[in-house]
């Protein structure tokens, strides 16, 4: 059950935003083997001057299509992470027109005790999930 948080520069139309979210979800399902109905996505839109993303030495020129994606998830093997990064970059470029140089991804790992879906319980620990 990965939680995806998207930080975007404001101004995308609803159709483009929906496509971005759908593509990201389909990649999570494929790369991380999660069920199709496990969809947890949050979008934060910011004025352009509120996202200061400078060059990390790779020579990229970022555009207003910038996507900064934070994924909170249980630990996964490096191969699955690499597959996720690759598929996401490929599909966002081919299906959404977002250059792979406009994609930044960070994965933060946690454990079953770190999730509660309500009722004051950690459902992964209680066996309800």
From Swiss-Prot:
Catalytic residues of the enzyme: 2 (proton acceptor)
Key word Kinase present: no
Enzyme class: isomerase
SUPFAM superfamilies named in the record: Tautomerase/MIF
Disulfide bonds: none
GO function terms (MF aspect): isomerase activity
Function: Putative target of GltR.
Annotated family: Belongs to the 4-oxalocrotonate tautomerase family.
Name of protein: Probable tautomerase YrdN
